[in-house]
Each structure stands twice: as C-alpha cells, then as structure tokens.
A protein has these predicted regions:
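N-terminal segments that cap or nucleate solenoid repeat domains
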Residues: 20-64
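Ankyrin-repeat inter-repeat connecting loop/turn
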Residues: 51, 84-86, 119, 150, ...
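Ankyrin repeat boundary/linker residues
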Residues: 55, 88-90, 121-123, 154, ...
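Sec-dependent N-terminal signal peptides
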Residues: 4-12
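Ankyrin repeat structural motif
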Residues: 36-44, 70-79, 105-113, 136-144, ...
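Ankyrin-repeat-protein effector appendages
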Residues: 19-27, 146, 179, 188-191, ...
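Ankyrin repeat A-helix N-terminal signature
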Residues: 30-35, 64-71, 99-105, 130-136, ...
C-alpha cells in the first residue's frame, strides 16, 4: 500500500512539474546531501526549480535538508525562498516541523511555526509525537505553547506520553503530564505509557505513570489522508496559475 501511495503521489508531483527533469531533481538532491547551499541556490534561481516538489527519495527539498542536517542550505537558501510552503510533508507524511522536533532544533521549529507550520497536522504522527520520541523536553514545551494537542493519537492509539515514556525521558514525561497528558490512554494492544517505560527498563517512570486500568473508549483523532492532501495542494497550484494574484 505504501509503495502504491508513493507511486501515485510521485506521478502527481511529476505531472505538476513536467518541465523539471529527473536529472535536475537528482542533482538537487545530491547538492542538499553535500550541504552545497550555493549550488542549491543556483538550481532554484537558474533552473527555476520549485522548492515544494518531491525529490527522487520522496522528500521535499526542505524536509531532506533538515533530515540530512544541511542547515547552511536550510537557513541561507530554503527558508528565504519566497515560494516555500513549510506545510508540505514528505511522501512518508513527515513535515519539516516534525523533523525539527525529533532533532530538538528549537530555533528552526520557531521559524517554521512563524512561517505557518501546522503544529497539529497529523498524517499518522504529529510533531509532538516526534519530539517525545527523542525526549526533547524543550521542544515539547515549545510545541505545547503553540497549541499542540497533548493527547493526540496515531491510528494505533499511541500518544506523545507513550512515546516519551518509551524514550525513558522523565523530563519529557513530566512536561506532558503538566500540560494534561492522560496516562490512561493505552495503545490498540492495551499497552499503557507505564508499560512502555517498564519494557524499556525504567521502573521509576513506570511507577510514576502507573494506572489501575486503561481508558476503554477509543480516542478520536483527525488523521489526514496524505493522498488527498497532496491532491489539494496540486489543485491549489493549478487554480493560482489560472488566476494569478494582481
């Protein structure tokens, strides 16, 4: 199913950007890997490459640059591009904010939020899940301050608190609890945050999160269909092309 999704979205991207050759896309991806900001700037400027389409690996240029720690390219080129859309995820459903979150890059996350990144967008996981997964307390607090849903769930009912417990980060666990995280929300297999901590060898965190029973009702969460989201972006681009701003 994932392979089909990637193929479908790749076709959408290729259709919308037919003038961009696979060779040029690969060249851009390689320049990002080298953190060659000058070359990336050249490709955007001289080849008129759109910063929002997909590279051969399924990432947008910004997502890939953050993933590979090409921060010179991110800060000097990509974040300054007037056409950049920081909301566009990779074909895996990972947004730039999610990758900034898991890396604990608070400055980058603040910039992305200022530029319009959606703190609660959920293609399966949220930025708060990612921050909790790597025990990023400062990032967790930043996201919560900007309206992150503390009890957001994945399709398998995994919460940020569950991920923080799994990362064995007491500071992250406490930051989420202070914000109202519900420790009785268990995943779809009935595993609680306390169980997750115990499985990772932390009896202290497990005891801290101990509950008598899991919450029985399934938690509702709006998980966005990635295919439909990308289609809506493409339709928006088409409408803008037909009705350019004055």
């Amino acid at each position: 199913m994932k392979k089909f999704l990637i193929t479908l979205l790749s076709l959408i991207s290729i259709s919308a950007h037919a003038q961009t050759t696979e060779t040029t896309l690969s060249e851009l991806q390689e320049a990002i890997e080298r953190n060659d900001a000058a070359r990336v700037a050249y490709l955007f400027r001289e080849k008129r490459m759109d910063p929002n389409f997909y590279l051969p690996n399924g990432d947008t240029p910004l997502v890939y640059a953050i993933r590979t720690d090409a921060m010179k390219t991110v800060n000097l080129v990509m974040l300054r591009h007037r056409a950049l859309n920081v909301k566009i995820p990779s074909l895996r459903g990972e947004t730039p904010l999610m990758l900034a979150a898991i890396k604990g890059d608070v400055d980058l996350a603040q910039t992305l939020l200022f530029m319009g990144a959606d703190v609660n967008v959920n293609f399966g996981w949220t930025a708060l899940h990612y921050a909790a997964a790597s025990g990023q307390k400062n990032m967790i607090e930043l996201l919560l301050k900007n309206g992150a849903e503390v009890n957001a769930v994945t399709e398998r009912q995994v919460t940020p608190l569950y991920m923080a417990a799994r990362s064995v980060s007491r500071d992250s666990v406490d930051a989420l609890l202070v914000a109202g995280a519900d420790k009785t929300i268990c995943n779809d297999q009935g595993i609680s945050p306390a169980d997750a901590a115990r499985q990772r060898g932390s009896s202290a965190i497990a005891d801290h999160l101990a509950i008598k029973a899991c919450k029985m009702e399934k938690q509702e969460q709006t998980i966005i269909d990635l295919t439909e989201f990308i289609k809506s972006l493409e339709q928006g681009e088409s409408a803008n092309a037909q009705n350019p701003a004055p």
